[in-house]
Swiss-Prot record:
SMART domains: BRCT. Residues 347-440 form the BRCT domain. This is Pescadillo homolog. Residues 449-552 are annotated as: Disordered. Residues 519-529 have a biased composition (Low complexity). PANTHER family: PESCADILLO - RELATED, PESCADILLO HOMOLOG. Residues 460-596 form a coiled coil.
Amino acid sequence: MRVKKKNTTGNARNFVTRSQAVRKLQISLADFRRLCIFKGIYPREPRNKKKANKGSTAPTTFYYYKDIQYLQHEPVLAKFREHKTFAKKLTRALGRGEVSSAKKLEENKSHYKLDHIIKERYPSFADALRDLDDALNMLFLFANLPATDQVSTRVTKDAQELCNQWLALIARERLVRKVFVSIKGVYYQANVRGEEVRWLVPYKFPENIPSDVDFRIMLTFLEFYSTLLHFVLYKLYTDNGLVYPPKLDIKKNKLIGGISAYILESKDAPFLSSVDGSADSENQEVQVLDKKALRHAMKADDKAGSEADEGDADSNEQVTNIELDDFEDKNKNHGDILEQPSQYDSPTSTLFSEFVFYIGREVPVDILEFLIVSCGGSVISEAALDQADAANVDVSKVTHQLVDRPVVKNKVAGRTYIQPQWVFDSINKGELVPANLYLPGESLPPHLSPWGDSVGYDPAAELAEEEAESEEEEEVSDEAEGDEEATLAAEEDEEDEAEAEELRAQKELELEAQGVTYSEAADSAAPSKKASKQKKRKTEEEEEKDLKLIMMSNKQRKLFKKMKYSNQQKEQEIETLKQKKKQIAKTKAKLKKLEN
């Protein structure tokens, strides 16, 4: 019989340590990390670490052997090796003082592309959209970061450009479905080609970058995610008949910026249109000139036509004019007219289509402009009125003014003054919320997450509970009326009990005649009575639960216990929130008393 070698089968064969993988690929550890991030390969946990590490118990990171074999044929790996040789040549040239040769080396430096990796990892467009959440979160994070030694200005500008291109397309196609304003930032959810894409946009506050963050890994992820978003944006823009990348209005970008600065050019249309539907000023002038030229040409044609008619008048005298018969439709009942399907399938897409919003200085324009435009509304910001072209803006069409101040002094007639939360709650509900709850200076209703738990805390449910309690109190009053009838029934029960006592006395006499004491008979009957009472206490549902628990496997039983524990924790959290709400209500009541 042939003796098997140790560590050649099983875990020892299927897994490779990180140091072995780096040695096999002949690259540095930093390049190995980058390659794993690009290809989507991550460390694995073997069942038996000792066997996988060939008898050693030292803490190590493991990878699948097949994954490392897969990396050996990667074109980017060859580019990493080329870059390594380039770095050696460059340091040698700079050490010798050969500046011209160093410049030539820099110009002829090899660059790698991640296009083929994107196509490998995302074979369909739906797969790319499903994995877009993390990409957008990373890009919006870097777009709001300040430029430092670790993060260059080029990186932040590229991230800002990509983010604005994404927002401009989402706003134009009206794809926003949900929004939630939290402490971390603003969460958005859009429906893109049937896929729900959710991302977080941080607030534009100065960021304090922690020192323990490894920006090398984050920048590698950013490089991959930016390539992915380029692919997705190109596909979405071209499918909607738009030119990618969109053109940028430099004047608007300097003054206001945001999505209104991007001009989305259609491939078929002869002019450019911005995200909010307003045409570019230069293109409007071109259109006016074209119309003038058209009028002159039409006048010239009319003159030429009249001269030709005068010359041919003699020949046309003999020609008789033939009038066509008019055919009337005798059927007066035209039937039901079918409504044409709307371009937008969601009610939120046309929620603000009839409104013009005026945004004050104290309100964040970038957040509300994106939401209002994506719901079909128009926006006029107070900051935009400071521009030179402010005279062309018609403020008389404003229907709603967003205010984040306690008191508005000079109110304009015909406008509805509301707080910004009205926009968020209307989008989440899919319909216009009553504006009287969101007036300036009013205490706002709770802004709840649209993705909240069904078991979670719902302040609106508390109102229903209070109503139920009031109904119960009414029932109690009705029960009090029926107490009189109950007293009559109690008197009858007392008579029955007296008869039962007489029967017991007779039984005692019979047992004494047989030679058995009554106390012994009572003791023997007591446990059976207790058991019957306990059985009665247990409901049918509890018995079913017990049976199910008995039939469960050990794994299922543990999972059930975990679920039970998590439900108990949720209930405790709900109770704490209710108590907090009560305390806040008490403090508010005390403050009102002090004010009065």
